[in-house]
Amino acid sequence: MNERKMKNYLFIIFALLSLTACHKEAVQPKVFGRYVPERKDDFAWENEYAAFRMYGPALKAENPSNGVDLWLKASPELVVDSFYYREHVLGLPYHINYGKGLDCYKVGHTCGAGGLIVLANDTTYIGGPYDRWTILEQTPERFVFRLEYDSLLVAGHILQETITITAEAGEPMNRAEVVLTGSYDGELLVGGGIYMHDTIDHFEVYEELGTVYYEEDALSDKTAAQMNYDFNGSTSQGRIYLTVRTPDATVTDIQDGNLIAVKDYQLGDTLTYFFGATWSEWKEK
């Protein structure tokens, strides 16, 4: 092989090695999400800091909300698939921390950890489970999906809700873009909220930033015997930190047990807000 051919050959080899290395790096996803038919139509997703889910039509009989459930993560490692597998195949509840994190945040029929808040006549309205889902974009660093709700009851009027949520690598906050349609002549305030549990702990309001912040102990509903004890024999699972930001919010306050950041809204407009959470036990690898 002459010198020129040798150089060309080496160039091709190095190029292939470089492409292989780039490919290996590119396929390491930092965000993820999917429809979860094996768990009553959940729609779950995660970024590097936390995992989330919203409830689907198969859960309607249990009166769920259009709120957001929160799963705590111990590291940036993706956990959604492993949590569901552990729960539904291995019989190991995700309400217990086996080292990767846990689900200890109760939503019920509330806005949960960053769900939509609609305020009309000083009353908070919470919707039910979604009717349809669509994945709009899925890459290792960006996940975008849309949920549609056919009947959000507000002050005796039925509205339709579409919410598009974006999770991006390196961003602790999810982006939510909401459009409400239907017929309602009264004033509406719309934005994001955090449900404050009975054991209301520490919260802060940054009115000028349109931001609310809340934290509480991470307590699972499993019995103490099922929990992982720390070295003091305590069932404490650390602290949960949650925040919502609605740009240009006109109200940042507590309403019906929710810490809210909402603004004036006209039907048909797109309203954008941000929500996120993390755990005191989260550590970057």
Q: Where in the sequence are the language-model features?
A:
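Sec-dependent signal peptide recognition
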Residues: 7-13
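Acidic (Asp/Glu-rich), glycine- and aromatic
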Residues: 161, 172-205
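Solvent-exposed N-terminal domain segments of exported/luminal and surface proteins
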Residues: 26-124
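Beta-strand-rich recognition/accessory modules
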Residues: 32, 238-285
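N-terminal secretory signal peptides that target proteins for export/translocation
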Residues: 1-6
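Extended, loop-rich substrate-binding clefts of extracytoplasmic carbohydrate-active enzymes
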Residues: 94-168
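C-terminal motif of bacterial Sec signal peptides marking the signal peptidase cleavage site
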Residues: 20-21
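A recognition module on extended beta-rich or small alphabeta surfaces enriched in W/G with H and D/E
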Residues: 74-78, 205-251
